[in-house]
């Protein structure tokens, strides 16, 4: 019975905050989840979001998602191996487990679990991203950042990025 209750609880959480069936979620939250689902090649980021929600509901949920997204995307773009990225998500899960509502701020200030190699990330992002696995995600993220989040982005199953920019632009 306990196991089935737990499965049901997390099934509802998934439906509400990952499949976005909760109408009270902001468009900014929905749009970030949408680009993460469309652009990331892994779903290892989902358990921390679900566990955070199970403990704290909407309390700073969007802020947590932004930190998690930056960590997950940053590590992926920097070429961190899948095993190390999974370990990082597990460390975030452990930190959530130790956190209470009273010390929630400490989770957000935990620079160790959300650490990204900013120097490497900046170098990579200033380089050629054509053909990289994360190029599509970066374009989705740019669209997200440039939008005003007045509407929820469509969650197309397949999205392609073709002929957006020339590979070899002219100097002028």
Language-model features, listed with the residues they occupy:
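Histidine-centered nuclease catalytic patch
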Residues: 152-172
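Short cysteine-rich loop/turn motifs with clustered Cys
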Residues: 136-158
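A cross-family structural signal marking well-folded subdomains
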Residues: 1-139
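Hydrophobic alpha-helix feature that most strongly marks membrane-spanning transmembrane helices
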Residues: 54, 73-76, 147, 166-170
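Short, solvent-exposed coil/turn linker segments
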Residues: 114-120, 148-149, 155, 166
């Amino acid at each position: 019975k306990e196991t089935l209750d737990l499965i049901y609880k997390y099934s509802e959480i998934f439906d509400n905050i990952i499949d976005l069936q909760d109408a009270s979620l902001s468009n900014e939250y929905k749009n970030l989840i949408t680009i993460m689902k469309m652009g990331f090649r892994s779903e290892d980021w989902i358990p921390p979001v679900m566990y955070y929600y199970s403990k704290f509901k909407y309390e700073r949920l969007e802020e947590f998602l932004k930190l998690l997204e930056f960590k997950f995307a940053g590590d992926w773009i920097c070429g961190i191996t899948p095993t190390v990225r999974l370990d990082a998500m597990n460390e975030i899960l452990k930190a959530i487990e130790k956190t209470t509502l009273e010390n929630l701020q400490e989770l957000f200030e935990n620079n160790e679990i959300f650490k990204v190699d900013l120097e490497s990330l900046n170098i990579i992002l200033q380089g050629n991203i054509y053909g990289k696995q994360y190029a599509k995600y970066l374009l989705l993220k740019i669209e997200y950042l440039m939008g005003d989040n007045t509407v929820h982005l469509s969650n197309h199953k397949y999205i392609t990025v073709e002929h957006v920019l020339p590979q070899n632009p002219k100097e002028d």
